[in-house]
């Protein structure tokens, strides 16, 4: 009976966290409340609530921040410079211009994919692409309601998790646990990319054609965001920072770090080169790209550089802290006795180790209600 109540309580806590997040409540507040509800259902009034919050919850919170704050910070600075330099807008305009209005959905998807694969934050890509997507969809007379799907397919799927070399945090989180780099399992990654991209485009094309047959067009909207027509750099200059990240990341992770003596990490830092080299490769790639953008656009950036760097640093905190909050929730759920039961069930779903890992991580990510935060919590539990 106690186990059943505990499992019910865990799902109640997850549901509460999801509902509060969808309602616009702060995850930073909702996550610990949901975690303590799970503790209450599992242990009753003997749940040691303060210890669960200040020790278990905050340990998961702090560990995630320690491991991934540099990636969030560098990513935010890179994204900010790509935005204010006009590079992101230049890439978006180039892709949509070359593919044309008849391939509006494909142009938006590919542009988002290029930007996210180059290291631009998912959130920034959504904001940068919205005005461009609006202009393209309006010209092609495609329903506006399909814009979120097109942006999500390009930014939040294969370039976020599957395409080899992606610097997005969801692709870099596993490096710490598996001792790999961001280029790990390239064949599987490419296969997954083809499935995600192909399936997503097939669905979006189906919905577009269905809307056209029904006579549904873009529609009329007031006070709409429109694409900024400011002067932007040439496509070669705009795309260079993305190539820099990819090349530096690849060279360091495949050629440099494998030949470096990392024994000092074990002796002085209680760590290993394998656990850190992947993250370092991504960070250094972003750093070189940031310096390149700043140098090339110095005259354009110098006046507001201090303020923009400050904004970028501040903007890196919100997604990081939200993910930390959810990882803290995952740390509490992992400490519950019922979590072991659910974990054993998840791991025993299939005798195939790879399939079992895929299914179990999906289940545990669902339990922790976050992509990056849930992935970190799931890998921590399965490590």
Residue ranges: model-predicted function:
Residues 9-21, 32-41, 72-77, 111-116, ...:
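Hydrophobic core segments of alpha-helical transmembrane domains in multi-pass membrane transport
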Residues 3-5, 10, 187-308:
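Long, contiguous bundles of hydrophobic transmembrane helices that form the permeation core
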Residues 1-75, 80-92, 96-99, 201-222, ...:
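N-terminal alpha-helical transmembrane segments of multi-pass membrane transport
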Residues 69-75, 98-134, 320-331, 342, ...:
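Hydrophobic alpha-helical transmembrane segments of multi-pass integral membrane proteins
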Residues 59, 90-100, 134-139, 307-315, ...:
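Short amphipathic alpha-helical coupling elements at transmembrane boundaries
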Residues 23-27, 65-68, 79-89, 116-128, ...:
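Short helix-coil transition sites and intra-membrane helix breaks within transmembrane domains
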Residues 54-89, 274-340:
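Core transmembrane alpha-helical segments of multi-pass membrane transporters/permeases
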Residues 112-129, 139-189, 193-206, 364-377:
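Alpha-helical transmembrane segments and, especially, the helix-loop junctions at the ends
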């Amino acid at each position: 009976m106690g186990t059943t109540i505990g499992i019910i309580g865990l799902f109640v806590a997850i549901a509460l966290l999801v509902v509060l997040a969808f309602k616009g409540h702060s995850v930073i507040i909702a996550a610990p409340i949901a975690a303590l509800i799970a503790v209450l259902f599992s242990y009753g009034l003997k749940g040691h609530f303060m210890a669960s919050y200040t020790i278990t919850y905050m340990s998961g919170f702090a560990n995630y921040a320690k491991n991934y704050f540099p990636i969030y910070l560098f990513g935010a600075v890179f994204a900010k410079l790509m935005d204010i330099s006009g590079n992101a807008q230049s890439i978006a305009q180039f892709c949509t211009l070359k593919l044309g209005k008849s391939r509006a959905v494909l142009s938006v998807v590919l542009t988002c994919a290029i930007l996210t694969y180059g290291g631009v934050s998912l959130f920034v890509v959504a904001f940068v692409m919205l005005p461009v997507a609006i202009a393209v969809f309006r010209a092609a007379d495609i329903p506006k309601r399909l814009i979120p799907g097109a942006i999500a397919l390009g930014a939040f799927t294969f370039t976020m998790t599957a395409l080899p070399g992606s610097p997005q945090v969801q692709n870099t989180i596993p490096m710490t646990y598996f001792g790999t780099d961001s280029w790990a399992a390239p064949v599987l990654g490419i296969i997954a990319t083809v499935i995600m991209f192909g399936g997503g485009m097939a669905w979006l094309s189906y919905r577009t054609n269905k809307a056209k047959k029904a006579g549904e067009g873009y529609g009329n909207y007031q006070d709409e965001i429109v694409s900024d027509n400011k002067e932007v750099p040439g496509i070669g200059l705009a795309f260079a920072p993305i190539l820099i990240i990819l090349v530096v990341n690849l060279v360091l992770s495949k050629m440099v770090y494998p030949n470096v003596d990392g024994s000092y990490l074990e002796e002085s830092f209680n760590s290993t080169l394998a656990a850190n080299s992947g993250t370092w490769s991504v960070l250094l790639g972003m750093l070189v790209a940031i310096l390149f953008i700043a140098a090339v656009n110095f005259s354009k950036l110098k006046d507001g550089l201090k303020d923009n760097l400050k904004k970028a640093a501040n903007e890196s905190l919100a997604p990081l802290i939200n993910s930390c909050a959810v990882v803290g929730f995952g740390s509490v759920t992992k400490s519950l006795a019922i979590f072991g039961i659910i974990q054993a069930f998840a791991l025993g779903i299939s005798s195939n180790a790879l399939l079992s890992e895929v299914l179990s991580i999906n289940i545990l990510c669902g339990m922790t209600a976050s992509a990056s935060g849930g992935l970190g919590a799931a890998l921590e539990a399965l490590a």
